[in-house]
């Protein structure tokens, strides 16, 4: 099993204005002359953490992390205005141009895989390779599975806590019920809903429930952005034109070397989506981790991701891995 690379600090960081309203935090670490890779975090609304730098050999990669609109250190915090998938795709291009990078590798898991696909299908000429994990295509059935009826059969205990802020008469549409509370002007209503929404995902993200992950997801500031922005995207169906847009447009990226890492027992983003993506991208490499759930910190997923980044960085730019 592979282990994380040693912890490193960024060699440069900054705030990049991307609209009159939004400014995003970004950072660079590793080798300034290495192969560039942009890390797209999950959620949406999850933000970046220092550990994400450690999935890449710092002597060979130029590692770019940034907080998407409303998340992490980006401002304004938890802002829903001017916050859509296509705003984020535009921000990625603005960041690439700001850093004078012609083409780069794209790494993303969960919602980060959604955004990676949306970005690469919009700008395929800018992508050298894709490393995707815990595939989320933001189709209606995926949303219903996790937030309405499906994952609840596997985690009925945690599901009860998720239900608590919503009265029984509103539970036929949990996304809408949560959205009303997460956009409430009442801070207490908003906070209660944000924590319940966020902790539900934190509880279900690993094959073996991790209490430390639950406490992270219960943090007030994290939960506020995470829950509000997620629910905003999901009630708007990801701002996609069709339910399976990301699968329909796979022909645009069929030539891009792609690795898909998927936990067999991922409850948050079930393997059916990774399987559908792999079939739509038959040249992709699908790695199924047999003893893992959703989290990129689970040993088998972590090992497969680091192995993939090592293989990518060792190959010539246009070569398959």
Swiss-Prot record:
The gene is pip. It catalyses: Release of N-terminal proline from a peptide. It is found in: Cytoplasm. It is an enzyme of class 3 (hydrolase). Its main location: cytoplasm. The lineage of its organism: Bacteria, Bacillati, Cyanobacteriota, Cyanophyceae, Leptolyngbyales. Residues 35-296 form the AB hydrolase-1 domain. Specifically catalyzes the removal of N-terminal proline residues from peptides. The active site is at residues 110, 266, 294. The keyword Cytoplasm applies. It comes from the Bacteria. Keywords: Aminopeptidase, Cytoplasm, Hydrolase, Protease. The keyword rRNA-binding does not apply. Its EC number is 3.4.11.5. GO terms for biological process: proteolysis. GO terms for cellular component: cytoplasm. Belongs to the peptidase S33 family. GO terms for molecular function: aminopeptidase activity. It holds the Pfam family Abhydrolase_1. This is Probable proline iminopeptidase.
């Amino acid at each position: 099993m592979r282990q994380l690379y040693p912890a490193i600090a960024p060699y440069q960081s900054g705030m990049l204005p991307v609209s009159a309203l939004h400014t995003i935090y970004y950072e660079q670490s590793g080798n300034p002359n290495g192969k560039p890779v942009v890390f797209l975090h999950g959620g949406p609304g999850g933000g970046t953490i220092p550990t994400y730098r450690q999935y890449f050999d710092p002597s060979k990669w130029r590692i770019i992390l940034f907080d998407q609109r409303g998340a992490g250190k980006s401002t304004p915090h938890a802002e829903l205005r001017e916050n859509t998938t296509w705003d984020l795709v535009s921000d990625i291009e603005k960041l690439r141009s700001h850093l004078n990078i012609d083409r780069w590798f794209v790494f993303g898991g969960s919602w980060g895989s959604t955004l990676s696909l949306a970005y690469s299908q919009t700008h395929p000429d800018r992508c050298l390779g894709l490393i995707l994990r815990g595939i989320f295509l933001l189709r209606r059935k995926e949303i219903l599975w996790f937030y309405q009826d499906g994952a609840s059969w596997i985690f009925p205990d945690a599901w009860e806590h998720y239900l608590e802020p919503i009265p029984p008469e509103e539970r036929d549409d949990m996304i809408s019920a949560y959205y009303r509370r997460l956009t409430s002007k009442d801070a207490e209503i908003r906070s209660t809903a944000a924590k319940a929404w966020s902790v539900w995902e934190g509880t279900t993200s690993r094959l073996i429930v991790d209490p430390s992950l639950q406490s992270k997801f219960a943090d007030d500031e994290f939960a506020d952005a995470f829950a509000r922005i997620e629910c905003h995207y999901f009630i708007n169906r990801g701002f996609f034109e069709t339910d399976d847009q990301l699968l329909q447009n796979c022909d645009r990226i069929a030539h891009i070397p792609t690795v898909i890492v998927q936990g067999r027992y991922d409850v948050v983003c079930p393997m059916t989506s990774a399987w559908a993506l792999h079939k739509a991208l038959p040249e992709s490499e699908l790695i199924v981790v047999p003893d893992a759930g959703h989290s990129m910190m689970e040993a088998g997923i972590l090992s497969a991701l680091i192995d993939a980044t090592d293989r990518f960085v060792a190959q010539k730019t246009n070569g398959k891995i």
